[in-house]
Regions:
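Intrinsically disordered, metal-sensing/regulatory segments
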Residues: 1-258
Length: 258
């Protein structure tokens, strides 16, 4: 039950954020979107460092001077994995007019949902690999540290849910469909978490690689999507401030609960 709830918490954060479409009448302003993107980026960077990369290196201590290698290799595999998905799947980032990936007849709404879904894949993997480490008895990963990551992802998923549902509403979708789009974008997280747990249980020695793989995938999303989004326009400083806030919140959660 503990693991089930931990996997579900980030998804609930997305759903709660998507529900904002029922209570807010206007679309999110540029200032708000940049603030939310900065906060999400800060949480993801802190989670990648404190919850994923450092435990990956600690678990490889027996390799001596090569203890960095699993984290190094897994990190690059994660980056390349997201780069490949980015090129293979048609998607449209919020606020952009030009779709990325192969040409497609998909609607703008569908491609916007796909963009956020791509973003959520590494987050689900990160939660899954943390709980896999806990279930395997890894001394570097406790139930509390896994919960800290789950809560941190849920916190940054709340604004993400709003970031997808509100623009969908602005695109002309009714509130119900806009909410559903936000919820569906987060559904990949518990699925990814469960698949990652199953994979890790089969190959426990690969846990350091899986931890750093999730970190690489998350940081790819931060650099490719969130940093440009939070830095646009004359309000760019607000994105930086909220990045620092998100980083601080996730760091505090990891240290306090881990």
């Amino acid at each position: 039950m503990e693991v089930f709830l931990g996997i579900l918490i980030p998804f609930l954060g997305t759903a709660a954020g998507a529900a904002c479409v029922f209570f807010m009448k206007s679309s999110l302003g540029d200032l708000v979107q940049r603030s939310l993107a900065g906060f999400a980026a800060g949480v993801m960077v802190a989670a990648s460092i404190w919850s994923l990369l450092i435990p990956a290196i600690e678990q490889s201590a027996a390799l001596g001077k090569l203890s960095f290698f699993p984290a190094f290799a897994g990190f690059w595999l994660g980056v390349l994995f997201l780069l490949t998905l980015d090129r293979m799947i048609p998607h449209l980032h919020i606020g952009s007019e030009q779709a990325e990936g192969p040409k497609s007849d998909l609607s703008r709404t569908a491609m916007m949902v796909l963009a956020v879904t791509l973003h959520n894949i590494p987050e689900g993997m990160a939660v899954g690999v943390m709980y896999a480490g806990f279930l395997s008895g890894s001394p570097q990963i406790t139930a509390a540290s896994a919960l800290a990551l789950s809560l941190g992802i849920a916190i940054q998923n709340f604004p993400e849910g709003a970031i997808i549902s509100m623009p969908l509403r602005a695109e002309g979708e009714n509130r119900g469909r806009a909410f559903l789009g936000g919820v569906l974008s987060g559904a990949v997280e518990p699925i990814g978490a469960v698949l990652t747990i199953l994979a890790a249980q089969l190959i426990i020695p690969a846990l350091p690689y899986l931890l750093s793989f999730a970190a690489g995938a998350m940081l790819y999303v931060v650099v490719e999507e969130l940093i440009p989004e939070m830095s646009q326009g004359r309000h760019s400083n607000i994105g930086t401030v909220f990045f620092a806030a998100g980083f601080s919140v996730m760091m505090a959660l990891d240290v306090a609960l881990g």
